[in-house]
Amino acid sequence: MARLQLAGSRRLVPLPRRAPRLAPLLLPLLLALPDGARADCPCKVPALCRPMTHRPDFEVFVFNVGHKTWKYYDWSQITTVVLFLKYDPELMCHAHAKGARVVLKGDVPVKDIINATFRASWIAQQVKLAKTQYMDGINLDIEQDVAHSSPEYYALTALVKETTDSFHHEIKGSQ
């Protein structure tokens, strides 16, 4: 066992000799990851973790409600998959491989979005979730009644604009 040394410049615990040699090897690998792809990408091909940037002439949305039914979709027709339930990394990788976007379902109580601070926090959480899960945007699905010219009406308009601005800024090409 090493003795404690209080004075002097000698190290008490020697540094591992191999660690410094690995750093120069790992850095180019990390830098070679495509934009938007991180080391924790669940896809076999890391490029599939990048956001989809193409803009189709028309949109065909599919609303995925779980299970593995997506394996039977006609992927030649689909441009966007909206996830209504649990995130499925296998679905995200497959959709991106087929050229389709995968987006969050955004639903929030209208009474809560009147508060601008709450709205900003909710949007930030959605952006963070989308980025963490390599998703391509959000589909706002608010099905609550909103009276014309009510505070909720203007808050909903603000929510759409602020969400769009935030997603477009944080995830290039997002919906």
UniProtKB/Swiss-Prot annotation:
Alphabetical list of SUPFAM superfamilies matching this protein: (Trans)glycosidases
Localization per Swiss-Prot or TrEMBL: Lysosome
One Gene Ontology molecular-function label: chitinase activity
Active-site residues, as the UniProt record annotates them: 143 (proton donor)
Glycosylation-annotated residues: 115
Membrane-spanning ranges: none
Predominant place of localization: other
One example of a Gene Ontology biological process annotation: chitin catabolic process
Catalytic EC class: hydrolase
Residue span(s) of domain GH18: 39-175
Keywords: Glycoprotein, Glycosidase, Hydrolase, Lysosome, Signal
CC terms in the record's Gene Ontology section: lysosome
Signal peptide range: 1-38
EC number(s) given by UniProt: 3.2.1.-
Superkingdom: Eukaryota
Family in the record: Belongs to the glycosyl hydrolase 18 family.
Function recorded in the entry: Involved in the degradation of asparagine-linked glycoproteins. Hydrolyze of N-acetyl-beta-D-glucosamine (1-4)N-acetylglucosamine chitobiose core from the reducing end of the bond, it requires prior cleavage by glycosylasparaginase.
Protein name: Di-N-acetylchitobiase
Organism, scientific name: Bos taurus (Bovine)
